[in-house]
Every structure is written in C-alpha cells, then in structure tokens.
C-alpha cells in the first residue's frame, strides 16, 4: 500500500502561497465592486459552459486553484464571502476585498506571528 505524500510549507513560503490564492480571488471579484463594476466571465463547473456575472459570491463559489496552498488561501477568503452572504444577503465582494487587506496586514504584523495575528483579528471582529 502506497502512503500518499503530504507536502508541508511554513514561514514566508507558506504565507506567500496563501496570499497568492487570496489575491487571485480578490482580484477576480474586485472589478465587480460598486456602481461601475464590470462583469466577469468564467466556465461554470456544473454546466461546463461560459457564464457571465457581476456577483462576488457566484465568482467565489466557482473559484478553485490547482496549486494546493494557493487554493487554501482562496478557500479561507471564500468562507468570509459565504458568511457575509448568509448573514447579510449582500456585500460579498466588499467582504473579500476587506479580508484580503486584513490578511495582508496580518502577515506584515509581527512578521506573521500566529498568536499576534489571531489576537489582532479577534479584536477586529469585536468591532
């Protein structure tokens, strides 16, 4: 029986990969933000045909990346979008863009110390 190989990343390399995934999703939805927001076209995973939308949660729902660590970053930000959509029914694009900025600030804060980041994000969530 062959045991599957697990890949582990840590430090700057892990942060860079996670941030790359976060940026890919945020860049995709940011252009749809506001009154002058643009449409995004993508291939639907369900119907395997092109789909056009300007809805951030639809774009987030369809987003997946092949690189596993970048995909983890994308999945983390998708959770923020889905929770916002569930609670408010709107604002997913704004939530994704703000979440990206929080992640970037957290990684810069204390060079990515996990305890400091958790405390800072928890403090922000209480506002």
Locate the predicted segments by residue.
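N-terminal glycine-/lysine-enriched basic segments
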Residues: 1-127
